[in-house]
């Protein structure tokens, strides 16, 4: 089964929520090493780092650096950003 990038980003969001600790602001945070070593994620994502980069480009997640490597960057926090509220989305229309 091949997922397109948008589908992979949606799956990534689900997996981060499953593995992460929620924050009071509505975001979720998980260490890269936890994501990378999770069996379920390994089975879903052919290229986890590529999916993370696509999600970062879409402003779905944020993390320090550009390229994450297993071992070296295991403690880097991946933050699933809180989705914008309807009011925030409406403010952006026509801007």
Curated annotation (Swiss-Prot):
Domain of life of the native organism: Eukaryota
GO process annotations (BP): regulation of actin filament-based process
Family classification: Belongs to the costars family.
InterPro entries linked: Costars, Costars_dom, Costars_sf
Lineage: Eukaryota, Viridiplantae, Streptophyta, Embryophyta, Tracheophyta
Descriptive protein name: Costars family protein WS02710_H03
């Amino acid at each position: 089964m091949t997922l397109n990038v948008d589908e992979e980003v949606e799956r990534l969001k689900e997996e981060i929520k499953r593995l992460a600790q929620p924050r009071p602001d509505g975001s979720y945070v998980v260490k890269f090493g936890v994501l990378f070593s999770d069996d379920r994620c390994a089975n879903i994502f052919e290229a986890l780092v590529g999916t993370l980069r696509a999600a970062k480009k879409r402003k779905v997640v944020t993390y320090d650096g550009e390229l994450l490597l297993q071992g070296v960057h295991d403690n880097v926090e991946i933050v699933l950003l809180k989705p914008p509220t309807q009011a925030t989305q409406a403010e952006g229309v026509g801007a």
